[in-house]
Amino acid sequence: YEIAQCLVGSEMCIRDSTYTDPEEVIDFATRTGCDSLAISIGTSHGAYKFTPEQCHIDPATGRMVPPPLAFEVLDAVMEKLPGFPIVLHGSSSVPQEEVETINKYGGALKAAIGIPEEELRKAAKSAVCKINIDSDSRLAMTAAIRQTFAEKPAEFDPRKYLGPARDNMEKLYKHKIINVLGSDNKLAE
């Protein structure tokens, strides 16, 4: 659980804030003995992280742009727990090209918006050691399967539609590892 969502014991569960309170992290880490800490700085699970009302429209692309992550909260947590591994749940970027492919081939993902990659790059350069992006892989897989079924409606062999899905997910993860998450070339370290 993110610390803003549910803390240890029923007396410390869910409150109204969507962000982690940096004043609570030392107590939480001490009481739980956790070896990493998922904090809330404006991320959320799924492909619908923000409402259209929370976003503004980029005039150059016509796409919705979400509000920035609360890096001041991340900085305050890092100050309270220097060097402690931080995790970000719900950090999918919701690649618009995958959303567009899904919608082109019969999907109905309206106003699906994620965390901009530049925000994730910034987080990856901090104490954040793990950034969860599962919705991105689901979108990549779904887009490839929908496209295959639309272009080859008689196809029923899973090897024929799961292969392109796997390839699309691999392409996505290579991009994220190399260009976004700062996880490439870590084996030598």
Segments (PLM) and residue ranges:
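Short, well-ordered coil/turn segments that N-cap beta-strands
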Residues: 33-35, 82-85, 129
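Alpha-helix-loop-beta-strand connector modules within alpha/beta enzyme cores
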Residues: 61-88, 98
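C-terminal alpha-helical cap/extension of soluble enzyme domains
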Residues: 104, 115-189
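Glycine-rich tight-turn/loop motif centered on a GG-T
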Residues: 11, 15-23, 47-71, 105-110, ...
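Non-cysteine beta-strand/loop elements that form the S-adenosyl-L-methionine
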Residues: 34-42, 133-134
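Single conserved hydrophobic/aromatic residue that forms the stacking wall/gate
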Residues: 1-9, 13-14
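Conserved, mostly hydrophobic/aromatic
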Residues: 37, 89, 123
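A general structural motif
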Residues: 18-21, 29-32, 41, 64-73, ...
